[in-house]
Curated annotation (Swiss-Prot):
Annotated GO MF terms: D-glutamate cyclase activity
Xref: SUPFAM superfamilies: PSTPO5379-like (SSF160920)
GO CC field: cytosol; mitochondrion; nucleus
PANTHER family referenced in this protein's UniProt entry, alphabetically: D-GLUTAMATE CYCLASE, MITOCHONDRIAL
The family this protein is said to belong to: Belongs to the D-glutamate cyclase family.
Protein name as catalogued: Putative hydro-lyase C5H10.01
Transmembrane segment boundaries: none
Source taxon at top rank: Eukaryota
Keywords: Lyase
InterPro entries associated with the record: D-Glu_cyclase, Putative_hydro-lyase, UPF0317
């Protein structure tokens, strides 16, 4: 099989902690409680991935592994690789490409620093399958589905900057409950690439309007995880096609308090929306929105 040659992708720049130390204080499989934020935060990625792989952790990954980059996953037939890489290059806000796997090898990453001792086909709590642009089924792993002609892509996630918001006492509303944040399909067009076209997906977090500029500044440093917001306020919601902030397309609705406005960030679920709009005939796989891949990469502001 041959593919059209394009310039090598420039992956988002991150640092890496190469030998994470395992944390042994996590709840066992028969415990029903959600680990506290502090328990989730201090767990290292290598240990969290082991818990997920063994089905000991099946919740949303929000709040897990503070300081490390969380990633969205998209797995495609390799014949679409160049088109997808170019889509990310042309649309870096919703699709900040961190790296990819070797074709047919979900345990081998480019760059290698993305993760050690990991299989991206087993180390995410849940996966989604799409066929002809439609959701087909949810899976616990995709080892059998990941054949020798499939390649995976990892895209930065806004969960990665939530610890920075918490440090400034801007605690995301969904974080204490461990739910995925609300996410919305918008009318913001993407720059097309080959077979791929579509619109942005955004994640939303409510905050007091008076804190908007501070929140923009905090998240602007995380360009490899969508950076600062793309829209905010009730008028901003209407402009991007979000009619009801209480009815997300993905994730869980959150409560608004008096004086709060919706703030929207680019979201790595965008590639799933692209797959649905592009209606690829072959099976395509992704993470379940809100259930991310925990990398060994860390952001250095």
């Amino acid at each position: 099989m041959t593919t059209t040659s394009i310039d090598p992708p420039v992956y988002a720049t991150v640092d890496v902690i190469r030998e994470p130390k395992a944390y042994d204080g996590m709840p066992k499989k028969d415990e029903c409680r959600l680990p506290s934020y502090s328990e989730r935060a201090i767990t290292k990625p290598v240990e969290a991935r082991k818990l997920i792989r063994n089905r000991l952790m099946t919740k949303s990954t929000t709040g897990w592994c503070e300081g490390y980059i969380q990633a969205n996953l998209l797995v495609l037939p390799a014949k679409y690789r160049d088109d997808f890489v170019n889509l990310c290059v042309r649309n870096p806000v919703p699709c900040p490409l961190l790296g990819e796997t070797e074709i047919g090898k979900p345990t081998e990453f480019k760059p290698e620093a993305l993760a050690k001792q990991s299989n991206v086909a087993t180390d995410i709590p849940f996966y989604c399958e799409y066929i002809n642009g439609k959701f087909s089924r949810e899976l616990e792993n995709i080892s059998k589905e990941w054949t020798e002609d499939y390649v995976g892509f990892l895209i930065g996630c806004s969960f990665s900057f939530e610890a920075a918001l918490v440090a400034e006492n801007f605690i995301p509303r969904h974080l204490p409950t461990g739910d995925a944040p609300p996410m919305f399909i918008t009318n913001i067009p993407l720059c097309a690439s080959g077979v791929f076209t579509g619109t942005f997906v955004v994640s939303m977090r409510p905050y007091p309007e008076k804190d908007l500029e501070r929140i923009r500044k905090i998240t602007s440093a995380y360009t490899n995880c969508h950076g600062e917001p793309v829209a905010w306020g009730w008028d901003g919601a209407k402009k991007i096609g979000v009619k009801d902030c209480g009815k997300p397309d993905f994730g869980v609705p959150v409560e608004f308090k008096e004086g709060e406005i919706p703030i929207f960030w680019g979201c790595g679920v965008t590639p799933q929306n692209v797959v649905m709009m592009s209606k690829l005939p072959e099976p395509v796989y992704s993470h379940k929105p809100g259930y991310m891949y925990l990398t060994d990469l860390t952001h250095n502001c």
